């Protein structure tokens, strides 16, 4: 990161009641002298004229001055809060740029300054963008929790535990005559198991946070003519898929992106799964399985007129056995308008079972509520944090190293190799908060921010 003084409009482009210009860097005080004729008292609102190079007034408004390191960016910061007309704001930026050495900020550069000056860690910086982009109250609350350090605190706790255990293991290695006793006394194993348990908990919360941010991928799967396309239409609230009585009508993947109370949901309708000689249908079935393997949840559609069973293993064991081990399954018994089934929601063998009529819409609202709960929707809006795909990847990598380290301890009692896996775990976790992060990754993250943030 350079030490340039940067300027940008901090409010959204366009017409508004108030417009804010933000300047951050060593020359902020020089800009204040040029435009205001004085440096405002630190952290006080100063109503004054904003003047051009000839002393003519461009606008009137509030000037706020924050002396580093006691500012958002950690640098000296000047904010000019004037009227929200775009022409006036452009004139102010042009005037600021007349001060030699000032340049326009890149997207996210103010937040990057804050990160580089240890005012924020990387998860908190990302949470700023996530708070701005939030599409639901739950997402906004979770992003705010991350901004306030909830996610970071849990990651830092894990890093501290891993670091302390690594130091203990390395101390044992330094005394080779006693190393085996150290490794087998149960203390190291106990600490390692507790770290793994804690990491599993954080990983589960992060997955929920990623769903809140990015949306849940739900695949509707089942045999031909079970009503999958009708359910897609019912959930989407429009006729997205062609529905006929002919089995195999849907031959390709159909996608709909909807919001349930602001929670993003990616619904995917797939070709009916069956053995077929039709080449085009075979391709559709292959694509269906590809979508299922990357789904967060499967709605297993069952034609209620063909079976009374509710246990998916009984309905179609080959299908269930092929599903990824940790994939969530919701059984949806369709055509309740024909079978006369009560529109109840039950649990069977650990799976939620819904009775609906996709054609008439009966029971669909209850299914929507279920999907919202799976996405982490909470009416009280308490708890949880936002997470991104890179966070999940780092947590998965950390888990992988811990499991390898566990094997080195339990099977081989190899202290050096355990210590190395703990070091790799520490690095993977530290990437989340930015303690060990490449410049390329930082550039990618901050470039996705708004200009002025």
Swiss-Prot record:
It comes from the Bacteria. (6S)-5-formyl-5,6,7,8-tetrahydrofolate binds at residues 22, 79, 119, 453. Its main location: cytoplasm. GO terms for biological process: tRNA methylation; tRNA wobble uridine modification. InterPro entries: G_TrmE, GTP-bd, GTP-bd_TrmE_N, GTPase_MnmE, MnmE_dom2, MnmE_helical, P-loop_NTPase, Small_GTP-bd. GTP binds at residues 225-230, 244-250, 269-272, 334-337. Homodimer. Heterotetramer of two MnmE and two MnmG subunits. Exhibits a very high intrinsic GTPase hydrolysis rate. Involved in the addition of a carboxymethylaminomethyl (cmnm) group at the wobble position (U34) of certain tRNAs, forming tRNA-cmnm(5)s(2)U34. This is tRNA modification GTPase MnmE. It comes from Shewanella sediminis (strain HAW-EB3). The gene is mnmE.
């Amino acid at each position: 990161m350079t030490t340039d003084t940067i300027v940008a409009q901090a409010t959204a482009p366009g017409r508004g009641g108030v417009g804010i210009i933000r300047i951050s860097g060593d020359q902020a005080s020089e800009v204040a002298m040029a435009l205001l004729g004085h440096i405002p008292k630190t952290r006080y609102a100063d109503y004054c004229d904003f003047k051009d190079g000839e002393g003519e007034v461009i606008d009137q408004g509030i000037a706020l001055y924050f002396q580093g390191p006691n500012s958002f960016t950690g640098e000296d910061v000047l904010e000019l809060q004037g009227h929200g007309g775009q022409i006036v704001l452009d004139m102010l930026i042009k005037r600021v740029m007349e001060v030699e050495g000032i340049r326009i900020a890149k997207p996210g550069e103010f937040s990057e300054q804050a990160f580089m000056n240890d005012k924020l860690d990387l998860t908190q910086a990302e949470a700023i963008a996530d708070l701005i982009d939030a599409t639901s109250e739950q997402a906004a609350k979770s992003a705010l929790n991350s901004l306030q350090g909830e996610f970071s605190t849990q990651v830092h706790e894990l890093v501290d535990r891993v670091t302390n255990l690594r130091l203990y293991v390395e101390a044992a290695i330094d005394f080779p005559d006693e190393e085996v006793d150290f490794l087998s006394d149960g203390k190291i194993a106990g600490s390692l198991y507790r770290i793994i348990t804690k990491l599993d908990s954080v990983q589960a919360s992060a997955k929920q946070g990623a769903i809140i941010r990015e949306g849940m991928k739900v695949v509707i799967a089942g045999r031909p003519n079970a009503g999958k396309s009708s359910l897609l239409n019912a959930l989407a609230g429009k006729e997205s898929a062609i529905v006929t009585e002919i089995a195999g009508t849907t031959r390709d993947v159909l996608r709909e992106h909807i919001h349930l109370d602001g929670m993003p949901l990616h619904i995917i309708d797939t070709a009916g799964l069956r053995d077929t000689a039709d080449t085009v249908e075979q391709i559709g079935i292959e694509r269906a399985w590809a979508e299922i393997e990357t789904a967060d949840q499967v709605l297993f559609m069952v034609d209620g007129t063909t079976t009374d069973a509710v246990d998916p293993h009984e309905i179609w064991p080959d299908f269930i056995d092929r599903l990824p081990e940790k994939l969530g399954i919701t059984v949806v018994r369709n055509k309740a308008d024909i079978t006369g089934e009560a529109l109840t929601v039950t649990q069977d063998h650990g799976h939620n079972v819904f009775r609906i009529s996709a054609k008439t819409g009966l029971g669909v609202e209850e299914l929507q509520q279920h999907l919202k709960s799976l996405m982490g929707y909470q009416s009280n809006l308490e708890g949880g944090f936002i997470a991104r795909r890179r966070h999940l990847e780092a947590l998965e990598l950390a888990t992988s190293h811990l499991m390898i380290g566990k094997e080195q301890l339990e099977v081989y009692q190899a202290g050096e190799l355990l210590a190395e896996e703990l070091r790799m775990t520490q690095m993977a976790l530290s990437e989340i908060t930015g303690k060990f992060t490449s410049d390329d990754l930082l550039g990618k993250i901050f470039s996705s921010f708004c200009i002025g943030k």
